Amino acid sequence: LRDWQRAGVWDQLHRAVLDRLGQAGVLDWSRAAVDSVSVRAKRRGEATGPSPTDRGKRGSKYHVLCDRNGLPLHALVTGANTHDSRMLEELLDTNPGVREQRGRPGRPRRRPVKLHADKGYDYPRCRRYLHERGIGVRIARRGIEDSQRLGRVRWVVERTMAWLLTFRRLALRYERSRTSIEAMLRLACALICLRRLSRLP
């Protein structure tokens, strides 16, 4: 599993399925969403840290970017003590993108038209980053705006998190190696997308 992750096999699988979905017109880039979920780690290991929401117990956090339909476009692993806002740039910058035109040259699509996020991303740095890249900003404002008002779009990423946690090895982390947990996360994203691809006529 780790060797294939180092060789990029799981990333390539995920990208191949996303390309097929993109070419079929299934991916919806009009509104994307980002969020994260924390899980406990049974052992000390790479990309773990004390969770501020779980009495300081050691854990990891999965950061996910999904399209309007909740299909995972990209995902990263960090320690549970990593603030969501710190991962926004890396999540978007390292997204390999999707080739939506089969057999035609051109850059893969990486950026949504608009991005939805909760108050954990309400920082000038995050808003500036999105504005500079021409991405519409829909981030709940701390102390002003109720995050539930954005729920009609953001609920899809919550559902995506629930899908990911149906994979037992992601719901509770056992592996010490960052490479191993990243492999499982990439494979889970690929399988979620493959389920959608299998329903195409």
Where are these regions (language model features)?
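Short alpha-helical elements
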Residues: 1-201
